[in-house]
């Protein structure tokens, strides 16, 4: 049986200047959705949906289900109407805000060493970002 090492992404593998990252994220998403959703409405819906995710203890629903059941109705638009635009944001725009993060200096050598020893690696993070955003954050680390 091989040993699996669990690393937390945030502040273990990746430093994020949240004071710069969150405003850049909100601004980029607002700009990308402009013309479809007003920035004020989008920000309120995003914050409310995120708060619902943080407050949920419902084991029968995923955080994505909780978020989406509130977010899209608050925008007054269906998921189907925005899914391509949001996918485009996370594919092409979100990666540009990675400059507000930096790799932890010892993280990559530690991961490389663990892999060279035959250990399996698992990375944990707070699941507030969509999967595509999380994968970008892992790559930044």
What are these regions (language model features)?
Residues 88-99, 107-139:
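Substrate-recognition element of Asp-dependent hydrolases with the DxDx(T/V) motif
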Residues 1-48:
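Active-site neighborhood of HAD-like aspartate-dependent phosphohydrolases
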Residues 18-22, 56-59, 131-132:
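Short, flexible/disordered intra-domain loops and linkers
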Residues 44-92:
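A metal-dependent, Asp-based hydrolase signature
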Residues 23, 27, 65, 131-136:
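Short, surface-exposed alpha-helical segments at coil->helix boundaries
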């Amino acid at each position: 049986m091989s040993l699996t090492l669990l690393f937390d992404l945030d502040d273990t593998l990746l430093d994020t200047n949240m004071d710069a990252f969150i405003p850049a994220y909100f601004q980029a998403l607002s700009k990308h959705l402009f013309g479809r959703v007003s920035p004020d409405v989008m920000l309120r819906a995003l914050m409310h949906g995120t708060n619902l995710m943080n407050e949920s203890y419902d084991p029968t629903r995923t955080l994505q289900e909780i978020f989406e059941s509130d977010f899209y109705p608050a925008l007054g638009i269906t998921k189907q109407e925005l899914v391509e635009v949001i996918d485009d944001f996370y594919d092409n725009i979100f990666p540009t805000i990675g400059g507000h993060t930096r790799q932890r200096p010892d993280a990559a050598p530690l991961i490389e060493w663990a892999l060279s020893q035959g250990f399996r690696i698992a990375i944990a993070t707070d699941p507030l970002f969509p999967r595509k955003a999380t994968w970008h954050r892992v790559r930044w680390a």
